[in-house]
Amino acid sequence: SHTITGIGDGDVFDNSTALNASLVTDDQRAGLYIFGQNRHRSAYDHDGDGYSEIPKLHGQTIGFRSFLKTTTYSKLTFEYHHMEEFRRGGDLLNRPPHEANVAEQTEHSINGGGLKFDYFSPNENHRFNVFASAQHINRDSYYGPGDRDPLDAYGNTTDLNWMAGSQYVYSFGKCIFMPSDLTAGIEFNQDKLEDNMWGYNRTVDQKVNIGSAFLQNEWKNDHWGFLIGGRLDKHNLIDHVIFSPRATLRYTPTEN
């Protein structure tokens, strides 16, 4: 599909083209969904002073999501996406940003994806999953020029984030006084950020690690629900372990 949107008096346009497709095997055991988008928007100068009120934009997105049923009771899911985006505002948009009077410019490249495995027992009393995901961002930027050398306003930022974990759920037909679901899980998350503004002699280089574990039990029937649990988090920039208790009470006066 393609859409065109006029801006202002209609001499500036925002063009967007999108595509998607899905494929599923005859036995329903595997499938693939593909998506993509391309967008182009020209800069809009409302009052004709040579400075944009709305920046120009170029962007592309493409990705897919797929699944494979490895057995009757298990499934593997994989997804990936890639995004590119360029934005530029100010004046003299056809010149390098450091030659403009005012310029704000960013260019992003993002790659991300995830992998997940799900399993449940034939009687559905046991449910188990393992997952992992990651995303990398690279951004080139310019904000200036301001009162300093115009070449000082260039910067670059990179960020890599990934996480992995597992979760297990056991369903009790009756635990003490009513049916319940016991849930336990672990997670690990790491974020690596590097931000450079060379002209200002500013650099941020930071790595954050967070390890987590949680346990909860939820009793529930048609009218009542009780949940008791807790979560432990260890942050590498904090000396002590953080404990977060959790408790909820639900009452539904009418039957579903």
Whereabouts are the PLM-identified features?
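Short sequence motifs at beta-strands and strand-loop junctions characteristic
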Residues: 8-13, 24-26, 54-58, 103-109, ...
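Flexible loop and strand-edge segments within Gram-negative outer membrane beta-barrel domains
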Residues: 41-61, 67-69, 73-128, 134-160
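Transmembrane beta-strands of outer-membrane beta-barrel proteins
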Residues: 30-34, 76-78, 126-132, 164, ...
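Hydrophobic, lipid-facing positions within transmembrane beta-strands of outer-membrane proteins
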Residues: 15-19, 30, 60-64, 109-115, ...
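Transmembrane beta-strands of outer-membrane beta-barrel pores
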Residues: 4-9, 25-27, 36-42, 82-86, ...
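Outer-membrane beta-barrel translocator/receptor signature
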Residues: 1-48, 55-62, 73
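Short loop/turn motifs that connect adjacent beta-strands in outer-membrane beta-barrel proteins
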Residues: 25-30, 72-75, 120-127, 171-181, ...
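Structural signature of Gram-negative outer-membrane beta-barrels, strongest in the C-terminal barrel
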Residues: 71, 177-183, 187, 196-256
